[in-house]
């Protein structure tokens, strides 16, 4: 092959090779900046732990009860084990009656490997971002939610091997939700004390005089 032609082909393919995706199996939703950040976290996770985390971000309109585990099996042959796949399908139907949509799946290569992360913690890290009412567009919320959930997943996997990752994100939303829960709990106790317990104690004291 002519060297000039070969050089042209290599130059044309270089951007594709540079952006070759390891952690993202399917992407219908994520912006390039988010995809690159996920790739960075995924590569650091593999380098430090040998664990693999993958993302499927799809705009497919799955029907109610669609089996996400079966859906991911078509990727299984090319995946490195042990692995976890984070599936984000915002247009998947949840119930037929309400027509509500949006499903998340976190699918490990084995039940044993599932012990290396907190399913609910990873799920909530993404959903908490998406459900917050703010000025962000739904597209931006989807991107931030997937990024935050993947970061939480990577941190969970790394922590299970006593490793700390440098490329992951602080879960500010998770911390905010935790603080809000504490405030709500404290407020409930305060209301209970002011309107029920304190008057009851005062009546008992006055009755004993």
Put a short name on every predicted segment.
Residues 166-209:
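C-terminal single-pass membrane-anchor helix
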Residues 21-174:
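Folded, non-transmembrane soluble domains that reside on the lumenal/extracytoplasmic side of membranes
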Residues 4, 125-129, 206:
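Intrinsic disorder/low-complexity segments enriched in polar/small residues
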